[in-house]
A protein has these predicted regions:
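Accessory RNA-recognition modules of RNA-modification enzymes
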Residues: 1-147
């Protein structure tokens, strides 16, 4: 029908059940409810909080496919936003796929009644709800488990 629905954490070619939460002029935004027919590229994410915690977007995709996807995103953004049609050099792979992030940004709720508020990462798609993340596989060890 030509109508675009953006559903995070889905892959091209998948059939999914999604819940639309916003309709704009040219597209809708939806939450993923269930993957009905998965892509052959779909992997089991390393982090059990993938899809809940808003920190990662691509753990369900092999690293090689992540690099190709990121390269394609740069090409499409240059074409769409700047009107530049060009081949982009492939994304350079990192020697570390896990434990590489040296900066993480935990959020916290304001203390109430003398009690320390929750500390965690923002729930995917939210600005005020937190997810407790006892261990983050992409963060360096020095950044995990701090409360």
């Amino acid at each position: 029908q030509g109508w675009v629905v953006f559903v995070p954490h889905t892959l091209p070619g998948e059939k999914v059940r999604a819940r639309i939460f916003r309709n704009d002029k040219s597209h809708s935004q939806a939450d993923l409810v269930e993957v009905l027919v998965p892509s052959s590229d779909r992997l089991e994410p390393k982090c059990s909080l993938f899809g809940k915690c808003g920190g990662c977007q691509y753990q369900h995709l092999s690293y090689e496919k992540q690099l190709a996807w990121k390269t394609r995103q740069v090409e499409e953004l240059l074409a769409h936003m700047a009107g530049v049609e060009t081949d982009v050099s492939p994304a350079i792979p990192s020697p570390k796929q896990w434990g590489y992030r040296s900066k993480i940004t935990p959020h916290f709720k304001r203390p109430r009644d003398g009690k320390i508020g929750d500390i965690g990462f923002l729930l995917a798609g939210q600005r005020s709800h937190l997810v407790d993340v006892p261990h983050c596989p992409i963060a360096m060890d020095m950044n995990t488990g701090r409360k």
